Amino acid sequence: MGRKRKPLPFIENVTIEAVAAEGKCITRVDDQVIFVPFCVPGDVVDLQVVKKKHKYCEAKVVRFIKKSDVRQEPMCEHFGICGGCKWQNLPYEEQIKAKQKQVEYQLTRIGKIELPEFRPIMGSVKTQEYRNKIEFGCSNKRWFTAEELAQLPQKEDDTVSSLKERHAQNAIGFHITGAFDKIYPIKKCWLMDDLCNEIRNFVFEYADSHDYTFYDLREQHGLLRDMMIRNSNTGEWMLVFQFHYDEEGDEQRAQELMQQVADRFPQITSLMYVNNQKGNDTFNDLELSLFKGNDHIFELMEDLKFKVGPKSFYQTNTEQAYHLYCVAREFANLTGNELVYDLYTGTGTIANFVAHKAKKVIGIEYVPEAIEDAKVNSQVNQIENTLFYAGDMKDILTNDFIRQHGRPDVIITDPPRAGMHPDVINVILNAAPGRIVYVSCNPATQARDLQLMDDYYKVAAVQPVDMFPHTPHVENVVLLEKRCETEIKQKLKERKEREKAAAEAKAAKEAEKLALQAAQAEDLTAEELAAKK
């Protein structure tokens, strides 16, 4: 017989203390850290622990004893179910305070480096309908809440098969965390212009009422698989369908659906589709077909136009992206004489945005299609002082590359969430630019990278930027300035001393361990071992 698991604790009358990572809140009971979702600081609750680790617990609210004065009513009826917008119950001014603290905490505790006073976080101009892109999944397995399930007709034999039958309804919406094959249907999403809701709801109603098959993720069949909607500040709209052709006639049915959408929504200037037979919903490696209009839309930023295709990366909050790039340009402090390297350039938005203030800008990006867009964006805007290269950053950005193209005066880097590869950091340090502007979507990995560069660069300015209201995500821009030679020598000396002390401590610990093992082998008591020493 297996060992009985000890029941997880039920904790009463707990006050939620603060906002923590990933949209959860934090409290402490008997020096144990507890993470709780869907709370706000000041809530008094009863908790059921659902997961217990050595250093922390995770719990869910069983009962609200007193709701915090800070709490606000979420605007969205899907709050707490769809998986997005986890901070809708927290007023926006409290959200950005929490994000400011998050950046300060991560740079201080992880980076452990000297920091200047942080600038106040730059809040988003819009807190609703701020996104320019949303992707919706389509499924023949609708997710039901407990309340919705209770309202469904009950069967006498509530077997696994009958439960599956009850879930067998079509849906378009978002994937549910922990139930990857099910979709929760969305009636209204507040993240994008309401036309997005109209398009999605029309597609569902038409397809469902005309007996279109919706995709089954486990069985991998069903015609309607996924849809991505983009819009731009030029008023253009893009819709990309992912279909899964199973049988003869599916392609014709897909064409009929797209024609219905095109007739109903003349605002759509780019309507594209792809037959995706893969095991996942990404289409970056697939060739798309054009049904109507152009294969792209345009975004405007100052006097620049940026071409955005279905596979392009473009910041999803257009208005706030402009303010983010303005901060990066300000920190770069260009005079027109500088050679600038723009690392992880994407579609060349930052590179082209700063090009008029630089002598030359070289952009590097992993995705070849993004580099093609970057080149097109330079051509569209008649920018002639940019060069773009596609490939893995650590393979492209080498000391040989810098010898060939010139030592940069300024480096702007905007890496993915994982941060920069150590090889990339080493090449940057060898290149020794006067300034580095580090744009990050993950202050934790940014802090790690700043620590690796601390011997040679000091942090001169920090500007958090909120790109995603109602979520825990935050961007951060850091200006690094090269230290003088005296500072560098002192920093390197301090590092050597720390490494020496750490090595000595490790050696002493190892010697003590070996001595203990020898004593055990000789069967010496602690007193005899001490006397022998």
Model feature map: region roles:
Residues C25-D30, G173-I176, V240-Q242, A374:
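Short, acidic/hydrophobic/Gly-rich beta-strand patch recurrent on exposed beta strands
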Residues M1-H78, L387-F388, D395:
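Terminal RNA-binding accessory module
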Residues G2-N13, A18-G23, E248-K533:
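Rossmann-like S-adenosyl-L-methionine
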Residues V62-P74, G80-T213, E247:
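Extended interfacial segments that mediate partner engagement and assembly in macromolecular machines
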Residues I229, G235-H244, K305-G309:
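Short, aliphatic-rich beta-strand segments
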